[in-house]
A protein has these predicted regions:
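N-terminal secretory signal peptides that target proteins for export/translocation
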Residues: 1-2
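Sec-dependent N-terminal signal peptides
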Residues: 5-14
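Sequence-structural signature of mature extracellular/luminal beta-sheet repeat domains
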Residues: 17-107
Length: 107
């Protein structure tokens, strides 16, 4: 019984995952469209909003070091990027985090 299910699942993946079904992508080196003086730090979480905009949680100019810093990051650490233009729609999170990581986006 298990062998039969394994064969069926294997056939399913073989049929569904052929090169014809794989979508290709094209790099847009103009996206995102951030201001010239903007510092995008280490991304610690990335999500997609209900309107398909990209939500980025990053560390700004903060670098990982030992001992851990005690000061909060001065830059906005959470960005909402427009899914079409790549421009910042909203940003917040300054003076909230020391060394952020992880992100969950809900409705």
């Amino acid at each position: 019984m298990i062998k039969k299910h394994f064969v069926l699942i294997s056939l399913f993946f073989f049929i569904c995952c052929t090169d014809d079904n794989i979508k290709s992508y094209e790099l847009d080196d103009q996206w995102p469209s951030l201001p010239n003086d903007f510092v995008l730090g280490n991304p610690t979480g990335i999500g997609v909003s209900s309107s398909n905009d990209l939500v980025v949680f990053h560390r700004g100019s903060r670098v990982w070091k030992t001992p851990m810093p005690k000061e909060k990051i001065k830059e906005n650490t959470i960005l909402i990027l427009d899914n079409k233009t790549g421009k910042i729609k909203n940003a917040w999170g300054s003076d909230l985090f020391i060394m952020p990581h992880g992100l969950e986006v809900d409705n």
